[in-house]
């Protein structure tokens, strides 16, 4: 998860944000399933990229020059930091804060393989 403050990129341009979300997904090595986006009135954008490995979402507040980004991936194939690096490069924030969470470890969920339709998981106590 990342927060970008003082962004100087076009935060209210849906096509721009969608295009760069797709590019960010490509940078991670993830498998893109679908991209959904919405522009809010009077301003603000949400774009969600559904991935075989999970998702990437971005929410913009142009009036605050603020962006929230979540990159949630399973397994070791994807490199989520590359998505953040790409978005940071095009949105040009003055300040960035990143929090990394390891999800599922305490539940024993282990991703065993990926398929075009998504990840196959098993519980470690099975």
How should these model regions be labeled?
Residues 1-126:
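Polybasic/polar functional segments that serve as interface/processing modules
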């Amino acid at each position: 998860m990342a927060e970008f403050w003082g962004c100087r990129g076009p935060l209210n341009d849906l096509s721009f944000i969608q295009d760069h979300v797709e590019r960010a997904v490509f940078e991670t090595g993830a498998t893109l399933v679908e991209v959904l986006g919405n522009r809010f009135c009077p301003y603000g954008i949400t774009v969600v990229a559904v991935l075989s490995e999970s998702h990437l979402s971005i929410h913009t507040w142009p009036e605050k020059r603020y962006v929230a980004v979540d990159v949630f991936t399973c397994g070791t194939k994807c490199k989520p930091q590359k998505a953040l690096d790409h978005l940071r490069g095009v949105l040009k924030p003055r300040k960035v804060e990143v929090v990394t969470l390891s999800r599922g470890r305490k539940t024993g969920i282990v991703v065993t393989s990926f398929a075009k339709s998504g990840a196959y998981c098993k519980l470690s106590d099975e």
